[in-house]
């Protein structure tokens, strides 16, 4: 289950094909420009006399918010952006300007996109490379493919939860403990759709945090995990298993009418593992089975699915993409090393200090490599 309200405010974000640069004032004495934006003028008259580090003080003179992009007007590629640009506020943008043409593009609320005058920087000096924007149309295909992927996962999940419920109806707790994990892992591969699932996600995979483990309103996979590994009887758990089956069936039936926001396709490539680091790799989501490392592996599978769908868009826009796979592979190898003979997993609380440090470091580095994708794959009005 992903935490709610996951999208973080990005008051100043840069989407570049080169290394992601800071958008705060940069040291080294770079030239500074103060530029005002309003509904009639997207930057007005401004100059760039030479290549090098430049700092722009951007002032929103409008009474509405919006977004400002620094673009290559020939390709609409984005050098840098100010997102969530509030009225009456000033933001600082710093970047290494190379030779070429530059213009500001304004996307204010309730107005059509507007591009300001272009400025030419002479010479043959290389600076940051502009990222060609991803459009809504380019994300429709990946979104539809993910819809099919999630539907297949939910169909599998129906059968797995039915098996789990049957185990408990027959009073076979050993079989139920065995069959709980593969069912839960299937759900853990569907992380890009959790927000689209809405209340179904709370019913199927909700944590006990707000309710407490004794509250009868707490249901789903974690409720069953708690009972199966805390000595509760099959008779006690059967109603929860039956409800889980009913919820998964209802979700599958409703899924064709649900939509994943296009922005989520790129956003979730980072957020799935971000939540794994916070909840799985800390042991927070371990209600007794000790299998949060397996859940993290399932989260990696879900992340890889998104990357596969986005690959045609990313391969020409993000030169850091090979590093994403390098660190996902490294993290996966470290996790698989904790899979024990007989199918059990080492609980996070029992990891050696070196193993835990290695896993956390690999996950953090993978997240760093994944981070630019949300901005690169964000659909933009051009």
Label each region the model flagged:
Residues 46-64, 91-106:
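Beta-strand cores of secreted/periplasmic/IMS beta-sandwich domains, seen most often
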Residues 31-50:
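N-terminal edge beta-strand
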Residues 37, 86-128:
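Extracellular/periplasmic metallocenter environments
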Residues 128-382:
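Mature extracytoplasmic or organellar-lumen-exposed domains after removal of signal/transit peptides
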Residues 61, 107-111, 133:
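Beta-strand-rich extracellular modules
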Residues 2-14:
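Bacterial N-terminal signal peptides that target proteins for export
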Residues 22-25:
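C-terminal motif of bacterial Sec signal peptides marking the signal peptidase cleavage site
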Residues 27-29:
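Bacterial signal peptide processing site
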């Amino acid at each position: 289950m992903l935490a709610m309200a996951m999208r973080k405010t990005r008051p100043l974000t840069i989407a570049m094909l080169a290394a992601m640069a800071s958008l705060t004032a940069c040291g080294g004495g770079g030239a500074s420009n103060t530029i005002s934006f309003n509904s009639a003028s997207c930057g007005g008259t401004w100059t760039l006399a030479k290549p090098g580090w430049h700092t722009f003080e951007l002032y929103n003179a409008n009474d509405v918010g919006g977004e400002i992009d620094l673009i290559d007007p020939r390709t609409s590629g984005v050098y840098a952006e100010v997102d969530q640009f509030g009225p009456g506020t000033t933001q600082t943008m710093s970047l290494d300007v190379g030779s070429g043409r530059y213009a500001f593009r304004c996307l204010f609320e309730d107005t059509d996109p507007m591009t300001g005058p272009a400025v030419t920087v002479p010479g043959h000096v290389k600076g940051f490379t502009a990222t060609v924007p991803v459009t809504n149309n380019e994300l429709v295909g990946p979104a539809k493919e993910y819809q099919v992927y999630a539907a297949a996962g939910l169909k599998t999940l129906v059968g797995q939860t039915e098996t789990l419920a049957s185990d408990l109806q027959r009073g076979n707790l050993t079989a139920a403990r065995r069959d709980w994990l593969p069912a839960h892992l299937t759900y853990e591969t569907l992380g890009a759709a959790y927000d689209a699932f809405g209340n179904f996600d709370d019913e199927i995979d909700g944590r006990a945090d707000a309710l407490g483990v004794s509250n009868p309103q707490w249901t789903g996979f974690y409720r069953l995990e708690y009972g199966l590994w805390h000595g509760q009887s099959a008779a006690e758990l059967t109603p929860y298993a039956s409800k889980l089956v009913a919820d998964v069936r209802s979700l599958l039936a409703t899924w064709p009418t649900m939509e994943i926001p296009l922005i989520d396709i790129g956003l979730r490539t980072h957020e799935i593992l971000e939540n794994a680091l916070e909840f799985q790799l800390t042991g927070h989501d371990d209600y007794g089975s000790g299998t949060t490392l397996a859940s993290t592996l399932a989260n990696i599978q879900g992340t890889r699915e998104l990357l596969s769908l986005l690959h045609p868009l990313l391969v020409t826009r993000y030169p850091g993409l090979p590093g994403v796979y390098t660190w996902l592979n490294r993290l996966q190898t470290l996790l698989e090393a904790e899979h024990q003979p007989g199918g059990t997993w080492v609980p996070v609380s029992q990891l050696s200090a070196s193993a835990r440090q290695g896993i956390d470091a690999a996950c953090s580095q993978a997240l760093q490599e994944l981070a630019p994708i949300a901005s690169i794959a964000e659909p933009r009005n051009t």
